[in-house]
Every structure is written in C-alpha cells, then in structure tokens.
Curated annotation (Swiss-Prot):
UniProt-listed Enzyme Commission number(s): 4.1.3.40
Entry binding sites for substrate: 80, 118, 170
PANTHER family noted in UniProt: CHORISMATE PYRUVATE-LYASE (PTHR38683:SF1)
One MF annotation (Gene Ontology) recorded for this entry: chorismate lyase activity
Protein's name according to its UniProt entry: Probable chorismate pyruvate-lyase 2
Key word S-adenosyl-L-methionine present: no
UniProt organism field: Pseudomonas entomophila (strain L48)
Subcellular location: Cytoplasm
Functional description taken from the UniProt entry: Removes the pyruvyl group from chorismate, with concomitant aromatization of the ring, to provide 4-hydroxybenzoate (4HB) for the ubiquinone pathway.
InterPro entries for the chain: Chorismate--pyruvate_lyase (IPR007440), Chorismate_lyase_/UTRA_dom_sf (IPR028978)
GO biological process: pyruvate biosynthetic process; ubiquinone biosynthetic process
Main location: cytoplasm
C-alpha cells in the first residue's frame, strides 16, 4: 500500500440525516452505530476477533482529514492503519489519524498499541467525547490493494479529549457484510 495515501477528488462525508432515506436499515445500523465497533465485531465473530496492523507512522495527512481536525492542509500526523478481523478475515479497514502537534502534547501514546484495538482504548476512557458519525463511499485509491473495491461504505468520527483530536475512519469490507448476513439467518 502506498504510505503517502493519495488525495482523491472531494469526498462527501454525510451525516445520518442525509442517508436515512437512501440506504437499507442494516447498512445504516452498521454505519451509524455509536457503540464500540470492536465490541460489535467481537460479538459477531464469537470472540474470534483480532487486529492486524498494516502501517503506523508519521506522514502528511489527507486534505479531508486535515479539514476534519482543523489542521492546515498537508500537516503531518500520526497514521495507524489496521485490519479488524473476524475469523482471520479482514472485515474492516480502519485508519486513525491525529495531528503531530496535538498528539505530542496530548498524552496519548499511539505508537504502543500494536495489535490492540484503538476503539477499545477510546471507549474505555470516559474523557473522550465522540463527535457525530459521517459516512461516504470510500475512495478505492485509499484502500490497501488487497481489499480495494469500488463503492465500499466507510464511516468516520472525531474523538476529542482535552484538546487532543483523533479521527477514526472504518471501511466495511465485503466479508463483514457476508458474516452479518449469515448471523441474521
């Protein structure tokens, strides 16, 4: 995967209100569930959940990420990309970012997460405030080659704690939709 993620044409991240009448209920439920995705995936996989880190490091953030975090375009930040897996299959591609300047003074050490879920950390720390979820058709060029499909739904939200902002994006891969469908049978 290119680790300077390419910029894409303007991506429209939309709130629930703009998608509520155009998407089916199961898709909306996954995109706009405000609970812990890690916990939901753990339940769906019957505790066969794991995190596979793909990339962690400093790089220029994408323009849409800078805008969401209130940073100058092209500002450098910490980027963490992982697969959230169920039964060893990639179910979700997740990309979490934070600006360098706020992360260095924010008291959160993302470099030591390894195979632990960032979501679990965010939901266990009551000081984090989650801002509203937004969803879009995630650009194929932003995905790892192995899972790059056109038209996949992704969501993102900003988590804030005492001036520290993290942006977490999660893209729902075909294997997740299949597992969710089988679970409802």
């Amino acid at each position: 995967m290119p680790y300077e993620t390419p910029q894409a044409a303007a991506v429209a991240w939309l709130p629930y209100s703009q998608l509520a009448t155009t998407l089916d209920q199961p898709t909306l439920d996954w995109l706009f569930d405000e609970g812990s995705l890690t916990r939901r995936l753990t339940r769906l996989s019957h505790d066969h959940f794991s995190v596979t880190p793909l990339f962690e490091g400093w790089q220029p953030l994408r323009d849409d990420e800078c805008a969401a975090l209130g940073l100058a375009p092209g500002e450098e930040g910490w980027v963490r990309e992982v697969y959230l897996r169920g039964h060893d299959q990639p179910w979700v591609f997740a990309r979490s970012v934070a600006g360098r300047s706020v992360l260095e003074r924010g008291g959160l050490d993302l470099e030591t997460l390894g195979t632990r879920s960032l979501g679990e950390l965010l939901f266990c720390d009551q000081a984090f405030i989650r801002h509203p979820l937004e969803a879009c058709r995630y650009p194929q060029t932003w995905l790892p080659t192995k899972v790059a499909h056109e038209g996949l739904w992704g969501r993102r939200s900003r988590f804030e704690r005492s001036g520290l902002d993290l942006l977490v994006a999660e893209v729902f891969l075909p294997a997740l939709w299949q597992a969710a469908k089988e679970e409802t049978r």
